[in-house]
Amino acid sequence: MSLTNKNVVFVAGLGGIGLDTSRELVKRDLKNLVILDRIDNPAAIAELKAINPKVTVTFYPYDVTVPVAETTKLLKTIFAQIKTIDVLINGAGILDDHQIERTIAVNYTGLVNTTTAILDFWDKRKGGPGGIICNIGSVTGFNAIYQVPVYSGSKAAVVNFTSSLAKLAPITGVTAYTVNPGITKTTLVHKFNSWLDVEPRVAEKLLEHPTQTSQQCAENFVKAIELNKNGAIWKLDLGTLESITWTKHWDSGI
């Protein structure tokens, strides 16, 4: 899929991986890049505009933990402004297993709520045009970092939720896939808390192993968006992009 003249809404598009991905996206000659994030970063927005002045870059403050009704209201404003949204990227995430409720609220519930809200506009059963959802998971959604089971569990939930969305595409007209970064050098992983402090040095130990840069991750992130494969589970690790085949151990039969 060419991203030329597409309208993309990027939740958390100013974070570590998020900002580098936004930089790559504007190079693709989008029509609009709408960034929703908790904290404004005028310098980053100005940089994105300077990279490609042909792309309209807009920022709206957004906390993914707000009720669905508030998200729907914000999306209504965005649709009124740019008329169509082609791709929604759900990228909000925190890594801190001391904050159990917030980890689940940001990493999973917020993603589900944002998705639910945009279906109000996209669902073909309501006359909508359909759309594409790219959800950011993590390799911990396949195999946990067991010292951070809350974070890992939230990312496993993202993978399963998104796989379900993909199978619902014939009904809703909305396709979906996950991009799942491996350990990436961002502020997220430099220091974080394990669950019940089971491993106080978890961040330090993790960074002893091979990692990738956020730029490497961002480049493969955008490649995955361009490949636009419904139901794909993409692994973005050590500068590579790989489609994961999920092993089926059970089937509902419906």
Swiss-Prot record:
The keyword NAD applies. GO terms for cellular component: cytosol. GO terms for molecular function: alcohol dehydrogenase (NAD+) activity. The active site is at Y151 (proton acceptor). Keywords: NAD, Oxidoreductase. The keyword Oxidoreductase applies. Homodimer. PROSITE patterns: ADH_SHORT. Signal peptide: none annotated. NAD(+) binds at residues 10-33. Belongs to the short-chain dehydrogenases/reductases (SDR) family. This is Alcohol dehydrogenase. It catalyses: a primary alcohol + NAD(+) = an aldehyde + NADH + H(+); a secondary alcohol + NAD(+) = a ketone + NADH + H(+). It comes from the Eukaryota. It is an enzyme of class 1 (oxidoreductase). SUPFAM superfamilies: NAD(P)-binding Rossmann-fold domains. GO terms for biological process: alcohol metabolic process. Substrate binds at S138. It holds the Pfam family adh_short. Disulfide bonds: none annotated. Its EC number is 1.1.1.1.
